[in-house]
Amino acid sequence: MNDNQTLNEINYKLSFFWIKKIIILLLRFFGIILDNFYKKDFYFCGDNNLESYFFGYHDKKPFNNDDTKIIFHSYKNLKSLENQSKKKVSINLINLKKRKLLILDNTKAWSWQLGSSLQWHPNKDIVFFNKKVNKRYITRKIDLNSNKTKDLNFSIYNISPKGDKFLIADFVKLGMLRKGYGFKKKKSQMVFLNKKSKLEIIINKNNKRKTLHLFDETKKKDVLGSYINHQTFSPNGKKIGYFYTLLKKNNQRQIFFYHFCLNKKKNYLVNISKSKLISHYCWRNNDEILITMKENEKRYLYIIYNTETKKIKTLNSKLNKDGHPMFNPKNKDLFVSDTYPNLFGLQKLFIFSLKQNKVIWKRYIYSPYKFRGILRCDLHPRWSNDGKKIFIDFIKNANRNIGIFKTSV
């Protein structure tokens, strides 16, 4: 191949790149026009254009136990979102009745998708989040009634329904192997990517760390590293669902979904299909899990998997896009979910009824093109504890924001 051929190929690829980008931007511009026709009946929405607001992942609730307060992150807007990921974010609280914002603290231990694992105690006005103190990652606990603060010697992922146990995560490892989900470290502080991953739990009574299950891939030469992510308790706190991922040398990720039974002290692989990729999940009850699963390159499935009987039920075929589901805490017939932006940049937020086998409520939210990849802003819908409101992260005026919808379904 001569130099002219090489140059022609480069010019062709560059031309194709710009043509593709222009088409995408034109479609997104049309999406902005469409967005103006869709209903935006927010009960609450952040209104400070100088700051960006967001909560985090869809497996936690920003509402306190009686739904009178919400917690979320904020940061002052910068031109470069990449620069923001190196800075602190504020931990905030709003009283929904008074609409008054209170800054509780700040943290550098956060990521775009998970935030700082900010969450409430299930029954008390106590807030937990990850924080970096004296070069160590810890969990900060703030009791809003007593104004007392306590630092716990672990990084929290999720708290149990009774508030007596914590699931913890290796966020530094996540930050290296799953960008956008973990904590960043300087190159000089990079830790060795070992091939061992632990499912760990903290018992609240004595803060004792316990390993529930150990994965060891050290003998597998084609494995570069491994990590555990998205650990959640079943409603009664007796089971734990989670993803275990292998990073292969061919830059491929092999993802497995497990549930661990605390009573039996056993780990179970959810072996639905070797060819279908499980992407997101939520607990419906103590035995059933709602799963979004990739069927092929263009289509996803929503299925309900029973951890006891191993039976699978596939939902309405029109639910063919990936999303982040959560069941209504008061009505297990209903779940809320979302979609990723389509060609026009529109994300769909919807409520699905299992009994009616259809979508019974929906809204469309526009997402600008610059919020993609690691920097994307998924809606990550979450119910309030009374099952009457839905909280989302979204983009408003080119900034991250939070919004709450009231529903009457």
Residue spans of the language-model regions?
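Surface-exposed loop and turn segments in beta-propeller and other repeat-based domains
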Residues: 43-52, 104-111, 209-224, 361-373
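Blade-loop segments of beta-propeller domains
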Residues: 51-59, 77-79, 83-132
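Blade-terminus and WD-like Trp-Asp/Gly-His loop motifs, strongest in beta-propeller folds
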Residues: 60-70, 110, 114-130, 157-165, ...
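Conserved blade-ending motifs and adjacent loop-strand segments that build the rim/top face
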Residues: 277, 316-326, 358-382
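Short, conserved, GDST-rich strand-edge loop motifs in beta-rich repeat architectures
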Residues: 17, 73-87, 169-197, 242-254, ...
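Structural motif
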Residues: 81-91, 135-140, 176-178, 195-200, ...
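Loop/turn-rich, solvent-exposed surfaces of beta-rich toroidal or solenoidal domains
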Residues: 299, 316-356
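Asp-box/WD-like beta-propeller blade repeats and closely related beta-sheet repeat scaffolds
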Residues: 106-198, 213-223
